[in-house]
Amino acid sequence: MALLEIAKKSLLAAEKYLALNSLISVQSQPELLSQVQASQERISADSGESKSSIDGQLIAVKDNICTTDFPTTCASKLLEQYVSPFDATVVRKAKEAGAVIMGKTNMDEFGMGSHSMYSHFGPVMQSAEDGRPARSAGGSSGGSAVAVATGMCYAALGTDTGGSVRLPAAYCGIVGFKPSYGMLSRWGVVAYANSLDTLYDAINGHDDNDPTSITPQTRERIQDRLSRSRRRGQRLAIGYPEEFNLVELDDPVRDAWENTLAHLNSQSHRIAPVSLPHTKHALSAYYVLAPAEASSNLAKYDGVRYGYRDPADRSQDGLLFSPTRANFGAEVRRRIIAGAYSLSSEAIDNYFLKAQSARRIIQRDFSNAFAQPNYLITDNLEEGRGKEGVDVLIAPCSLSKAPFLEDVKMQKSALDSYVNDVLTVPASLAGIPAICLPVMHGENDPVGIQVMAQYGDEETMWEVAKIIEEGLGSGVGSKTQPTNPTVN
């Protein structure tokens, strides 16, 4: 199908599903089609060369990633009119690869939420077809997930701090990918938690502007070590973390997990239980570390340096929130207060430093589980030889399928939503790559299953993900556009 025809179908989908509120801003149709036409003419020319696999494809961008063509609001009143003077590195690289940015997607304000409900522009929802109530799109990249699932775009960029790409992907029945921390540039991404935020082919690579970006020399060293010890085309060791087998798992989720492991076993791969004993502390550690970093990162939004300024703001001493900063949503204010407390002199030892310690132990648990060592922290090839361990870990992405939006709204406490991240947060704390795939469960909606691998070993992760998708993912995803990924 010609690129122009695909783009027109995507625009029709964007119009049809407007009520789902997945988009905050959209490129004008003439400008968008003009860019696609230019790509099509370039590819159809005598040389027939495209810039990349995404040349002429429509890409949506989460609204906490800076763009010069659209406002970057972070779904907050404070930044409602803010237009960045530069493109984020991932956006610039996507444009250089020929991608057409079709718009900015809705999200939880500043990335803080699990259902994309905490937005100044209203909640995101999944399509309520056949008279059924609307379901949650997940968060915080719910707008990106819905845009892909409904065929509004070829793929979408999101950010994954504690599962904010993988959880929406699981709920919406699409693919969501979080790379190893530092592999994609975070420059131009509005930070929630610097040490946890992550945003592949066209956009992968080092960026001098991002101090957390892995250098070319380190990337080369890691890939060289991995390639020399990787089991190419051989029987893989597939682990399932015992601590993820929670009593709260819904039966369809547990069944899909078991079916995935059974399918991999039928392909002659070895299945083994793995213990990650300290991941039970992951959720509580995350909700100390992330708000602490957020309280620091959001301090600049005071109406002077960045953001909307309330005329009533007199910067009165003693106010917890000035009138300007009171324009943060309730969930953002809640996390700022929690983060500020955990960094206070009376709490930092008991909360923040202990959470940092828990994070390091969780990273060690994951590193010890894999057959390959983490070559980011070791250069010793001998360390990986003969080591017992697995090549990847397989686990669910969520405790259940997407809940009904009304049920989420009726929760007595916002804290009830935090538990939704319990299965995605561990990989974020460890900084390892993880991909969520939709796996069919009988005649029902797909269930999100994640594949996790050692730091930098995206290749093995992709290999196993392909086996799962080919065997259990047939026909999943949107009726219009099955399994295009939302990457972070």
Swiss-Prot record:
Gene3D superfamilies linked: Amidase signature (AS) domain
GO BP, sorted A to Z: glutaminyl-tRNAGln biosynthesis via transamidation; mitochondrial translation
GO cellular component: glutamyl-tRNA(Gln) amidotransferase complex; mitochondrion
Catalytic activity: L-glutamyl-tRNA(Gln) + L-glutamine + ATP + H2O = L-glutaminyl-tRNA(Gln) + L-glutamate + ADP + phosphate + H(+)
Region ranges (Disordered): 205-228
Coarse class of the protein's main subcellular location: mitochondrion
Subcellular location as annotated: Mitochondrion
Active-site residue list: 62 (charge relay system), 140 (charge relay system), 164 (acyl-ester intermediate)
Keyword Nucleotide-binding: yes
Positions with biased composition (Basic and acidic residues): 218-227
Transmembrane segments: none
InterPro entries with a match to the protein in the record: Amidase, Amidase_CS, Amidase_dom, AS_sf, GatA
Top-level EC class: ligase
Function description: Allows the formation of correctly charged Gln-tRNA(Gln) through the transamidation of misacylated Glu-tRNA(Gln) in the mitochondria. The reaction takes place in the presence of glutamine and ATP through an activated gamma-phospho-Glu-tRNA(Gln).
Subunit structure: Subunit of the heterotrimeric GatCAB amidotransferase (AdT) complex, composed of A, B and C subunits.
Protein name: Glutamyl-tRNA(Gln) amidotransferase subunit A, mitochondrial
Organism whose genome encodes this protein: Tuber melanosporum (strain Mel28) (Perigord black truffle)
